[in-house]
């Protein structure tokens, strides 16, 4: 019986083994998770280098933060370095194996050269003998010749970027400032990597695996990847649920490092947030605790892999953060001796995961995203929004929501301030004269994200028009939406609607006062003045009424001058922001928060309202009999209240130019009447211009037949004889210039780089001459106390040649001089060096097989002591495991 069972088991095992043997393993794209950290090596200007290990082989892994590259505007330099190393297959250039990336970092996996850099060796030696310096310069010259023949300019050549191999040969590295000219504007492809041999017969040393080739041709992303579809994200995350749970248990945060008490409540928050956000991997989670104020949870995605690893990025610091490839795994923590969360805390936190999963099970990803999003239209939040917000409160304890912060702008004038935010964010009511229906253009843009910042004003305005939704019965609609929103959103929405209604009633009353002299039989539906003008004037009218004429006494406006403000117009678009005269007041108020909106908006718009006349009066002029009376009456009242100012403004005729706001769009269409005026029609108009300070406060085309001018002058006297033209360019400052920045180390910069001229491969030969002088003397030729003095020495070519016993040989001095030639066209290159007497004994064809004067003798394969001399000389303290 047992034997039979055993035989059956064996036969079944053979069947399973045969099936497994027939399966073809699917190769996985390379991932940074496959590498383990051994120790840090060095730190440069654009990243840190770590000693990594994979499959028993050591690699040098350069880690570059994407955020730093974005802040320094050098994202293209990281791409250039990757491409330059990927294209290079030379024995004198560091070999690049992988190019990987995650959500936060870019990883360049290169060969590890145990001999350190030449700068460290130079600090130990003091200076090199002529024979040693010639060999090093010869190998670097071959590397430069190879790069230049393949369209690559290094532009950062210095001893720090020359590494020493195990045999003592030189290899160039750090192509962060390199310039690649492939005569095309696309990224490198597979053919570029496979067909770039370093010699006539490519050796096996330069062959790459398919995974390496795939990683080297992948595109680098420097922005957070957008959220994927529900189906795709579900498929990706379903394969990593167990990995995600392990990751959440092994997280290292400042709280755990500081040995603070971790309560079950905080663990519940952590796990509930991680569990909830898995429905949308691209959605950031903010403020899990006060200690993780700036932490964000993102998807760590390899550049060439579709695998996604969930992680929580803690507050990075030199003493707490650890690279661990952004996944603070428990295995790495045990190896490095780091403090991890205790298992009893993990058990407590895992118990709460099922409860939180039940709460989030019925939620839709779209609903939860809309609930947490700071920029959305609250009218589209479904009925489950209240539950989502309740869950959000669990994830964000102690964090004031964005709606509450908007309401706390001014504790005294909540309604007024909120209304101003609403009106200046394009929430406007537009009346259609044909059917009398009202449209509401809703754009709740209280806070901007990167997409809003990058978008142009024209795109925003077009989007405003597309987002218009009908509100035929405002009260019923608002009541219907109240039942579908949370209490906080309802308060904001009700406040906005009620204020809009009160503002509209105010505007309607004031409009009746302005239009009292217009034809009595004209119906409101046929009124040529769009209702948007009334809404725009509500702010000014409210300022005048609520401040009890506080500022009227100090200004030159009379009581009747408010009528002019009712018909204020904008030069191009009256239904969208950007051209309104109130824009300047809003900008000033944002710069000076202590000053109330009433003060800034009212004080800056007094003169504007005085001289503003609606162009719509051109189509509906006053009756012939009432015209003169209205003009005389208004003119006399204006003169009575502000005679001195008007005399100053109108004594001399001024040519005016119609300006537009910087945020206004030029070619976008609009349905309001004033926007239909063409630019050529401005020639026939009288334009009034008033300046206050350094910018025009009001520039509005005056009405053809009626002009507010002193009664001593006739309208014919203010006609302009000069054609009015818009400026040809409104850009402030100098136009952007490509490669305007001076990048590199000051001592090794060529004169053409300092002068901002066009440069080519000759800049590398100049730097090679500086390195030759430094190898022979131990000090760069143009070294000085400050960078400015170094630049002056370079431009003057001030070289302090050694004298006496330290004097250089004539051949060495001449070689330095031909390399350090100011005229880049006459500067020496590889041909001149090969023919120079200093390099007469160099076997250029078999240079990589020659015995080098210095061969490193490390203690073991992980010895990094040869890099310490440079770090100590530059006072670089490489912390344990901080990025």
UniProtKB/Swiss-Prot annotation:
What is the first-listed, main subcellular location in coarse terms? Answer: cytoplasm
- Positions carrying N-acetylmethionine are 1
**SUPFAM superfamilies hit by this protein:** Protein kinase-like (PK-like)
Please state every residue range assigned to the domain named AGC-kinase C-terminal.
840-883
What is known about its processing and modification?
A: Phosphorylation at Thr-745 by CDK1 during M phase activates its kinase activity. Maximum phosphorylation occurs in prometaphase.
Q: Which UniProt keywords apply?
A: Acetylation, ATP-binding, Cell cycle, Cell division, Cytoplasm, Cytoskeleton, Kinase, Mitosis, Nucleotide-binding, Nucleus, Phosphoprotein, Serine/threonine-protein kinase, Transferase
User: What InterPro entries does the annotation carry?
Assistant: AGC-kinase_C (IPR000961), Kinase-like_dom_sf (IPR011009), Prot_kinase_dom (IPR000719), Ser/Thr_kinase_AS (IPR008271), Ser_Thr_kinase_AGC (IPR050236)
Under Gene3D superfamilies, the record lists: Phosphorylase Kinase, domain 1, Transferase(Phosphotransferase) domain 1
Query: Where in the sequence is Phosphothreonine found?
Result: 209, 224, 523, 726, 745
- Top enzyme class, one word, equals transferase
Q: List the catalytic activities from the record.
A: L-seryl-[protein] + ATP = O-phospho-L-seryl-[protein] + ADP + H(+); L-threonyl-[protein] + ATP = O-phospho-L-threonyl-[protein] + ADP + H(+)
Instruction: Specify the Protein kinase domain's residue ranges.
Output: 35-839
Specify whether RNA-binding is a keyword of the entry.
no
Name the EC number(s).
2.7.11.1
Instruction: Tell me a Gene Ontology molecular-function term this record carries.
Output: ATP binding
* Residues forming coiled coils: none
Q: Where in the cell is it found?
A: Cytoplasm, Cytoskeleton, Microtubule organizing center, Centrosome; Nucleus
- Give residues annotated as binding ATP: 41-49, 62
Identify one Gene Ontology CC term for this UniProt entry.
cleavage furrow
Pfam families per the record? Pkinase
What superkingdom does the record give?
Eukaryota
- What this chain does, per the record? Serine/threonine kinase that plays a key role in M phase by acting as a regulator of mitosis entry and maintenance. Acts by promoting the inactivation of protein phosphatase 2A (PP2A) during M phase: does not directly inhibit PP2A but acts by mediating phosphorylation and subsequent activation of ARPP19 and ENSA at 'Ser-62' and 'Ser-67', respectively. ARPP19 and ENSA are phosphatase inhibitors that specifically inhibit the PPP2R2D (PR55-delta) subunit of PP2A. Inactivation of PP2A during M phase is essential to keep cyclin-B1-CDK1 activity high.
Family affiliation = Belongs to the protein kinase superfamily. AGC Ser/Thr protein kinase family.
The protein depicted here goes by the name Serine/threonine-protein kinase greatwall
Q: What organism does this protein naturally occur in?
A: Canis lupus familiaris
